[in-house]
UniProtKB/Swiss-Prot annotation:
Location in or out of the cell: Cytoplasm
Family note: Belongs to the thymidylate synthase family. Bacterial-type ThyA subfamily.
Domain of life: Bacteria
Function: Catalyzes the reductive methylation of 2'-deoxyuridine-5'-monophosphate (dUMP) to 2'-deoxythymidine-5'-monophosphate (dTMP) while utilizing 5,10-methylenetetrahydrofolate (mTHF) as the methyl donor and reductant in the reaction, yielding dihydrofolate (DHF) as a by-product. This enzymatic reaction provides an intracellular de novo source of dTMP, an essential precursor for DNA biosynthesis.
SUPFAM superfamilies according to UniProt: Thymidylate synthase/dCMP hydroxymethylase
Enzyme class: transferase
Cystine pairings recorded for this chain: none
InterPro entries: Thymidate_synth/dCMP_Mease, Thymidate_synth/dCMP_Mease_dom, Thymidate_synth/dCMP_Mease_sf, Thymidylate_synthase, Thymidylate_synthase_AS
Protein name from the UniProt record: Thymidylate synthase
One cellular component (GO) term of this entry: cytosol
Subunit structure: Homodimer.
Length: 315
């Protein structure tokens, strides 16, 4: 099944259109692509490079809690959302440190600046962890995924828990074609640190199996997509566990599927590696609800990947 992902990387390298992008990095992209993963045949955590499952778990649990503040993530040594919160802070009047303009590019090109950035970033993370008032102001990312999944605000000021509603519908009306959760809220997009890349997902029940399809408007193929595949596969497993279903397929539909210019060599290296068997996901059988799970309740067994391939993140 990993071949589905590798085929996407190969296709972009061979056929991708060069495009400028919001980050100024430049990408090779395709529009409209779909991959399918049979979750009964193994948990789709890529093996052609190590994918940090602990980060995937803590991010998904963060979403499930409806949380949008990076403090929860930092407490679990998860730094994948740091840059977007840090960017908001260094653009504020409260920031008095060295100039951090365009830090995402400068840190790759200027070793002296990279040291400055590392120091300021560490100060920022320490402040988030140790100062609740600072964390409330600068750890917040706006109404991103968790808020939309669990607390979608309506025009009358009430809130919709989309995810809880969908889980209940899977139990009571599994043939419904409305088993949908959307993270794309046009009213909130301007105030989000990063508008949702994975925008909407839908569940489908057939012959006692739960399948999930994700529509992802923007797909960072080398860094982001391996996380997204594993995250939504895990979400499908968790909901199947609560609803008493087996797992079916994870269907991943991509809008703008892109490979950043500075990820080309890394993708080529990954494509040169031999695929290994997917691991097995193990969930704590004593936990009944999706919302009761914690880090120690979710494990993978038999994960034997090739080494990590590092690549810069585009902010």
């Amino acid at each position: 099944m990993e071949e589905a992902y590798l085929a996407l990387g190969k296709k972009i390298l061979e056929e991708g259109h060069f495009k400028e992008d919001r980050t100024g990095t430049g990408t090779y992209s395709l529009f409209g692509y779909q991959m399918r993963f049979d979750l009964a045949k193994g948990f789709p955590l890529l093996t052609t490079k190590r994918v940090p499952f602990g980060l995937i778990k803590s991010e998904l649990l963060w979403f499930l809690k409806g949380d949008t503040n990076i403090r929860y993530l930092l407490e679990r040594n998860n730094h994948i959302w740091d840059e977007w919160a840090f960017e908001r802070y260094v653009k504020s009047a409260d920031y008095q440190g060295p100039d951090m303009t365009d830090f995402g590019h400068r840190v790759l090109q200027d070793p002296a600046f990279a040291e400055q950035y590392k120091e300021e970033h560490q100060k920022f993370c320490d402040a988030i962890l140790n100062d609740a008032e600072f964390a409330e102001k600068y750890g917040e990312l706006g109404n991103i995924y968790g808020a939309q999944w669990r607390h979608w605000e309506t025009k009358d000021g009430s809130f919709i828990d989309q995810l809880a509603n969908v889980i209940e519908m899977i139990k009571t009306n599994p043939d419904s074609r409305r088993l949908i959760v959307s993270a794309w809220n046009p009213e909130d997009v301007p105030s989000m640190a990063l508008p949702p890349c994975h925008t909407m997902f839908q569940f489908y029940v057939n012959e006692g199996k739960l399948s999930c399809q994700l529509y992802q408007r923007s797909a960072d193929v080398f860094l982001g997509v391996p996380f997204n595949i594993a995250s939504y596969a895990l979400l499908t497993h968790l909901i199947a566990h609560e609803t008493g279903l087996e797992v079916g397929e994870f269907v991943h539909t991509l809008g703008d599927a892109h490979l950043y210019q500075n990820h080309v060599e890394q993708m080529q290296e990954q494509l040169s590696r031999e695929v290994r068997s997917f691991p097995t996901l193990v969930l704590n059988p004593d936990k009944a609800s999706v919302f009761d799970f914690d880090m120690e309740d979710i494990k993978v067994e038999g994960y034997d990947p090739h080494p990590t391939i590092k690549a810069p993140i585009a902010v």
